[in-house]
Amino acid sequence: MNQKRGVSDVLAFFYALWSFSALGRSSYEYLFKNPRPANLVPAHLSTFVGVLYIFIIVGLRRRSPRAWWITLGLLLVELSGVLLVGTIDVIWRPFPYATVWSNYGIGYFFMPLILPFLGLAWIVRRETRAAYGVLRRE
């Protein structure tokens, strides 16, 4: 197994696992939680997270400069989101029930907080940028 491919495969596996989890959570929330508009915000947020994770998986699997830039942006959106929602939830608790990013992903063993850091650390490496064609091989 190619080491460069191996790391992206492991990241893609975990993102797939968490996307199923986030979309499953949002489906449950849409079906069984009180459908008042204020109660739909956590469901919408969980759906957004699940779809975001799917796009990150696609970016991790493709190898092009465009895919690298898009994946970098998506990872930054994910990190910003989990930090923002996690902080708001700790300080204020605005949602009637938890989201994927509540308390920095405590319900998911903090993986929503850890994964973007791992993804960013991997994607900015020189070898990874070269594999995506962002950095010219010397």
Residue ranges and their predicted role:
Residues 1-138:
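Topology signature of small-to-medium multi-pass alpha-helical membrane proteins
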